[in-house]
Amino acid sequence: MVQASSHAEGGHEGKQGAARSLGLLVAAVGVVYGDIGTSPLYTLKEVFTGGYGVPVNHDGVLGILSLILWSLLWVVSFKYVMFILRADNQGEGGTMALTALARRATAAYPRLRTLMVICGLIGASLFYGDSMITPAVSVLSAVEGMGLAFDGIDHWVVPISLVVLVALFLVQKHGTETIGKLFGPIMVTWFVVLGALGVHGISQSPEVLKAFNPGWAVNFFVVHPGMGVAILGAVVLALTGAEALYADMGHFGRKPIARAWFILVLPALVLNYFGQGALLLQNPEAARNPFYLLAPSWALLPLVGLATMATVIASQAVISGAFSLTRQAIQLGYIPRMQIQHTSSDEQGQIYIGAVNWTLMVGVVLLVIGFESSGALAAAYGVAVTGTMLMTTILVSAVMLLLWKWPPVLAVPLLMGFLFVDGLFFAANVPKIVQGGAFPVLAGGVLFLLMSTWKRGKQILVERIDEGALPLPLFISSIRIQPPHRVEGTAVFLTARSDAVPHALLHNMLHNQVLHSQVVLLTVVSEDQPRVPEHERFEVEAYGDGFFRVLLHFGFMDEPDVPAALKLCHLDDLDFTPMRTTYFLSRETVIASRLEGMSRWRGNLFAFLLKNANGNLRFFNLPLNRVIELGTQVEI
């Protein structure tokens, strides 16, 4: 009986584990694969009607299908799923997490480290551009299907798309926890429908399966040498969203994402692309919208509805990704602090950042109004996608060679293969800059300027403050000679440098001429890792005479809650009772000057960013009634 019971318990646990794995797989499909899953809506349409001159004939169709298939296998299956997903930063992925990893890998090489940071900022900047383009092109392409069902409705495509998109951004503040539970089942349904449509199309023209032979892709380049590289600018549309596999790894882990790709997503995508190809072999005129024309006429309206839901889910994924990327960038010091709201009491990762939300919404609305169709927007899409992919490969190269210590004889050929393919795709999209691709380049350029100015400005600000800093040991020696009046309680002074006297402490002494019985110089350290365990959160050093130095360590995914962290400082001599603790902050006002380090116009830009950034009070969750803020002017 005992043996039977243990078998029953083991079986129950096994069922629970299987159910959890299935749940994670379905959830990953809903969040991770929305973008790449909606690519069949517009990829082949853009290839054959986007002005590339690709003939809709036997060789042209098979050549393009072979290019799409082997691009999916090389870039997504091999590069991302089997390789890039292993380059996690303690389970976290994405551009900022990878930049932090590359920064650590190149710590001994300052110039190379700077280059890695620049690549990371470029990748992040292009991701924000992608976060505007994805909702616009996806929803437009879905709604355009209505034009096939109803005559004369084409002029309603833009207004309907705008209503859907604006509504999506308006609900962000309230969170998507409830409706988010439907994302997985809806996207699973979407991929099943993709596969079913593809099987139906292939059954009408099975010869399309010849495209599995990579020789057709090679043949396309041979027959169309002038068109070969250029057409990659449209083929890459089949790969949009590949970066999401890596960016969302922290939510689901590598295995559920990989399993979902190989079990459901990849087969469904390949079947659908081949089904569309089979349709084009039978009816070349279907190139105007092969996705929707692949469906029976009775299924057109339900398919438009399902496609619209799928594109909204894809849009939600990149919006959430932009929020997550912003939080990481703030913690790592690349973006000014902004107000971050949590939209779920259970999920720490579900956040809302108003400034990012409204900026994205304005960008998306302008894109829809300006471009009016998914085909026109497709030109802008490839630049952002391929640029981000290229930056990811460069960052991974540094991690692979310098942190993982892979033998160059193994690593270099592999990395050269990745860089060669990424470089080809990027080169194919460069000419598109004048055809609409300028948008992500300009948006990325502006964001890169803002992030680099903020990072450099903060460095110069700390240097200027440090120039006249009074060493802490000297200060403590002086108060031993002339002791000031001491009052009960603990004074916490936030400072970037823990071995010097903060300006706020000097100002307090100058104006109030008192010191608290306990004086804590607190430095918050942002680490190049996602989370810091509680037992590694703090370092405490006692200087005597009631002076203490405390270092608090936070990862870029941690909530920097200073009062909560200080409660962990178990030291007999140190008292952080809330009503006996006062926090002293220094508020710097920057004045741009002609001093070395930064041009005057960038100095003014940094001053503007600093003025509008969220202060330490909110960012560190300090109690409003226990904070004193003292101002100081700094020239940079």
From Swiss-Prot:
It holds the Pfam family K_trans. Keywords: Cell inner membrane, Cell membrane, Ion transport, Membrane, Potassium, Potassium transport, Symport, Transmembrane, Transmembrane helix, Transport. It is found in: Cell inner membrane. It is a multi-pass membrane protein. The chain crosses the membrane at residues 22-42, 64-84, 115-135, 150-170, 182-202, 220-240, 261-281, 293-313, 351-371, 383-403, 408-428, 433-453. Belongs to the HAK/KUP transporter (TC 2.A.72) family. PANTHER family: LOW AFFINITY POTASSIUM TRANSPORT SYSTEM PROTEIN KUP, OSMOTIC STRESS POTASSIUM TRANSPORTER. Transport of potassium into the cell. Likely operates as a K(+):H(+) symporter. This is Probable potassium transport system protein Kup. It comes from Pseudomonas putida (strain GB-1).
